[in-house]
Amino acid sequence: MGRAYSTIAFDPAKCDGCGDCMTACAQAKTGTDDIARSRIQIYGREGAADKTFELALCRQCADPKCVTVCPAGALNKDGTSGVIGWDATKCVDCLLCTVGCAYAGIALDEATGHVAKCDTCDGNPACVPACPHGALKHITTANIYNEVGDWEDLFAPGLAGCQGCNTELLMRHTLRRVGPDTVLATPPGCVPGMGSVGFNGTTGTKVPVFHPLLTNTAAMLAGIKRQYKRVGRDVQALAIAGDGGASDVGFQSLSGRAERGEQMLFMVVDNEGYMNTGMQRSSCTPYGAWTSTTPVGETSRGKTQDAKNLPLIMVNHRCAYVATASTAYMEDLYDKLDKAIAASKNGFAYLHVYSPCTTAWRFPSNLNMEVARKAVETNFVMLWEYTPQDGLHFTKPVDDPLPVTDYLKAMGRFRHLTPEQVEHIQKKVVENQKFVERMTEHAHVG
C-alpha cells in the first residue's frame, strides 16, 4: 500500500491577513522578523468584494513539478516525510523551479541569493501555532493511514450502504483497529442493514457476528463474553449499535450491563434517528429536525423535543470509560478506540460516535466530513472523554465556536426552521456547553 503524508491546510475564511504566520516562519528559518524571507506568504485577493486572502506555500506535491524541471537534481521528495528537500550543494540558482511551481511555494530569498521553501520545520511547523485564528492546521491524519493501512479490512467489500455512508467508514476503521479476535453484535439498524450479518447466504464480516434484538444487544453480548471466558478464550466483545437501539428500546439492556461493569466495548453510531427503517425520529434526534415521523407542514415544524444526551447518561453509570467521537477527527477517534479497548478488558466501555447520514439529513455525500466537522466547530457536538479516576475533560475544546447556523444550513433537514427555532437551538447548544464545562471542573465525577 502507498504512503500518506502530513500537510499544512489553509482556511481562507478564517484568515485576516495579520501576518503572524509569516513572522513566525521568518524567525524560525532566518532568525529575523523580515516577512519577505518567510517561506509562507499571505496575499490579499485583488478585486474581491470582501477582503480575502490566498496562501503561497509549498504543497509538497505528490508529483512535484519543481523536481521535474530542476536540471541539477537539487530538489528531491523524501519518501518517508513527503517533504521536498533542497540541496544547496547541487543548486545552480537557475530559478526554473520557481517557474515550475503552480503554488508559488518556492521563491528566491534575495538575502542569500538562493531559493527557499517550506520544509514543515521537521514536522513541527512554526506557522501553525502562530496563527491566532486557526486558519492554518497541521493535518497529521496520514499517520493513521500509514499505521493501519496494511491491516486487514474485516468487513467485506461492496456493502449495501448509501453512497458516502459515514457508518461504513466507521465500521471499517473500528474493525481494523479492534482486530480479528473479536465477537461482534450488531442489532437491527444500518450496520446489519448494509451487510454486517450477511447477505445472499454469506456473512459481511470476517469475525464471528450475531444479530440480536433491538432490546437485548448488551445482555446477549455479555452472555457470549462470559461463555468465552469459561472456556479460556480472551476475545474482544464489541457491539456496534445505532442510537435508536441504544437510547430507546435497547436502553434497559445497555444500562443494566453498564451498571454491572460487564467487560465489553459498546459503540453507538449516532445518526440521530432510525435511518434503516425509513428515517423515523429517535430520542437522539435533535430539536427541529425533519424525519418521516416529525414532518414539516402547516401544523408541524419538525421534532418538538430536545435530543437525549445519552453519553452523559452513561457517565452517570460510572463506566470504566465513556467518550464522544467523530469521524471528522480520526486521530481523536483512534486514541479513544485504544482507551476503550483497554478499559473493556476490566469493565464497561462506551463510545458514542456522531455519524452524519447523507440520506436522512439531506446533504450531498461529498460533504460528509464537512458536516461532521461543522457540528464540532459550532459545539453542536462536543468531544470529550471520562474515566472514574480522572473525571471528564474535553479532547477537542472549541473556545470560540461558530454560530450554530453554520452547521444547520448545511443540511436539508433543517431548512424549514424559523428564527425562533434557530434561537432555541443556539440557546440549547450554549446551555449544553456550560453544563459539560461545569462537569470538567470536578476532577472526579464519581
From Swiss-Prot:
UniProt KW Iron keyword: yes
UniProt superkingdom: Bacteria
All residue ranges annotated as the 4Fe-4S ferredoxin-type domain in the record: 6-35, 49-80, 82-111, 109-141
EC class (word): oxidoreductase
GO BP of this protein: L-phenylalanine metabolic process
Catalysed transformations (reactions): phenylglyoxylate + NAD(+) + CoA = benzoyl-CoA + CO2 + NADH
UniProt cofactor(s): [4Fe-4S] cluster
Purpose of the protein: Involved in the anaerobic metabolism of phenylalanine and phenylacetate. Catalyzes the oxidative decarboxylation of phenylglyoxylate to benzoyl-CoA and CO(2). It can also react slowly with 2-oxo-3-methylbutanoate and use different electron acceptors such as benzyl viologen, methyl viologen, FAD or FMN, but NAD seems to be the physiological electron acceptor. Also catalyzes an isotope exchange between CO(2) and the carboxyl group which proves partial or complete reversibility of the oxidative decarboxylation reaction.
Protein name (database record): NADH-dependent phenylglyoxylate dehydrogenase subunit beta
Organism name: Aromatoleum evansii
Gene: padI
